[in-house]
Amino acid sequence: GADDNTPDMPQGDIPLDFGVSVDQAVSRAAETTASSLSSMGVYAYYTGNNNLSTSDKPNFMCNQKVERTNSASPWTYSPVKYWPNNPADKVSFYAYGPYAPKGLNVSGTTQSGPPTMEYTIQGAEADQADLVIAGALPNQTYASNNGKVSFKMFHALTRVDINVTNVDKATGMTITVFTMGSLLDGKR
């Protein structure tokens, strides 16, 4: 997490609590669902009574590992962070899951603005993650969500399987290029 000894960080009496939902995937290997997600990385920005801006840094939590043992157990993390005592003070959140899969590089405490992620697909299918992300939950207060930060995760990747059939039974053929166009809206 971020530096826990920073003097301007809130030390309230009510701990931050987390919840997660995951949108339904259409086609993924080792699909991440709300019940199968057991860990996530959380970024939190404490901004006092100011709204989140692009110049803010993750000074409250930075890639904090938040985990649970099963879908019925609570989310836990250490050290525990608390909601500010001042009801006007705000904390903004981002999250991704699962926490730190192979091939994922995430930004640190020195980067301003939203966290950035770079993911390299692993060669072995067993090492590939179904990465889910939650966009910003800006300017949260204890009163705005009754103390529970609820992330709505979305699948960041798409799995594409290509099957080629040689109907002529010809030999010596090689596929040298395969191209997919940009399908931003999911339609052709």
Region spans (language model):
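Sec-type signal peptide cleavage vicinity
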Residues: 1-188
